[in-house]
Amino acid sequence: MSDLGLLAQDLNDAVMSANARLDSRFVQAMSNKDIEGAMACLLDSPDLVLVLFGKVLRGPAAVRQFLTEMFASMRTVHLEINEVTHWSFGETVFAVGTATYEFEALDGTKSTLKECWTDARQKVAGRWVYVLDHATQIP
């Protein structure tokens, strides 16, 4: 694995599959405006950090409030992961990729947001969750 080969490791099939399922569950929850489903994909701890388009959200309560407000302002949300690469450092899996959100606001206005993101995931209490997510809008 590139210049980081001594540190970074490719994922074994089981870990890769589990992380692909995590991504799929998150995409489905966001596209269904399912707050509980989205929150189930995230670390349930004050240590959770999301950096979304310049806004730092710390802990599940802040993320839940953000999602509640976002979903309340949208008639529909559709998320698609365009591409993603996963690798591990010890017990942590990192991912980097791009995604596209398609929104329809309550007034019918449609918009598209493309993002580049990096996240860190860990297996906590038997399930993989996002512990850090940093997304930046692509112009």
Regions found by a protein language model. Give the residues of each.
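A beta-strand edge to alpha-helix "cap/lid" segment located at domain peripheries
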Residues: 1-40, 47-139
